[in-house]
Amino acid sequence: MKRPLYCSTGALVGRVNGYDFRGAMKILRSLYKEERIRGLELMMLPAYYENRAAVTEAVRQSGVPSPVIHCEKEIGTMLSDAGALTDSGHEEEARALSEEAFRLFRLNCAFAEDLGIPRMVIHLWGGRTSDSHIARNVGALPELTETAAAHGIRLLVENVPSSAGDPLSNWKRVLPFLGNGGLIFDSRFGKLHEQIRETLIDPAVAPRIEHVHVSDFGGGYREFSALRPILHPGEGKIDFPALAGLLDRMGYAGSVTLESPVMGENGWDVPKLGRTLSYLGSLL
C-alpha cells in the first residue's frame, strides 16, 4: 500500500548546521519535484519564534505541501513540570509555567495557521517528569484542543517516552479527552517500550492512529539513553517489514514522516536521505 510519505524539517535543520532552514527547504523542494516525498512536516524549534515571517515565507516559496506541523517538544515537558509543581503544592509556580506553555502553544498554532497546516503533532508529556503526573497532562488536553481548533488545527497526540508508565496505557487515558483529534505512532518510541505490535493491533487505539513517524532504535527495553543518536531504518533493531505488515493488517492509509537526520557540520548527506526515502517508499 502506498501511503503519503513526508520528510521532517527536523531531519535537515538543527544547531549543528546553524539552523539553516533555507538550505533545508531547497533540498526538500528537490525531493518533492522528484516525487520522492509528497510533503514536509514542519518541526518547530525555539529558533523559529523570532523568525516567523522568514520561516513561513521559505515554506511558501518552496511549493512543498505542509500537511503536518510538529509542536515544539519542550511544551510537553513544561506541562509535565507544571503538573508536578501543582501536586507538590507549588501552585503559583505551576500556574506561571503552565501559562508559558500555553503561550508557546498559541505561537505554534499561529505558525500553523499562517501556512494553512491542518494537523499538529504534540508531545503531551515529556522531560524528566514525563508521565509521572499524567492526569495533569491529560487534563490540559481539552484546552489545548480548543485553542488549536480556534486556529483551524486538529491535534495528534504522540506515543512519547514514558518513564512512569508506558505510551499505550497513557494513550488509553487520553482517548476519552481526544475529541476530534487523533494519535500519531512513532516507531522509535514504540520499540523503546517494546510496544510496536501491541499498539498496532489494539482495538481501542489503532483506529485513531492517523500519522506515523519513522526512525530506528538500537537500544534495549526502556533504554532511554539509546534514544539518541536517531538512527535510519536498517541501522537499529526495528523490523520494518514486520511494521509495514502490521500497518497493512490494520488497513492503515494515513501518512508517514521520516525523522532520521542527515545533517552535520559539513552539510547534508542527501544521498543517504534519498536511499532511506526510497526504501520507505517501496516498503510503506
Regions found by a protein language model. Name each.
Residues 1-107, 113, 149, 180-182, ...:
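N-terminal pre-domain/capping segments
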Residues 8-12, 43-45, 71-74, 125-127, ...:
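Active-site beta-loop-alpha junctions enriched in small/polar residues
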Residues 18-21, 25, 51-56, 131-142, ...:
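Distinct, well-ordered alpha-helical segments
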Residues 37-38, 65, 118, 210, ...:
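Short acidic/polar active-site loop segments enriched in Thr and Asp
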Residues 39-40, 145-237:
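Acidic/histidine-rich catalytic cores of soluble enzymes
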Residues 80-182, 192:
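Active-site acidic/histidine proton-transfer and metal-coordination neighborhood
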Residues 235-249:
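A short, acidic, amphipathic alpha-helical segment used as a generic capping/interface helix at domain edges
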Residues 263-284:
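Aromatic-rich peripheral "rim/lid" segments of glycoside hydrolase catalytic domains that contact
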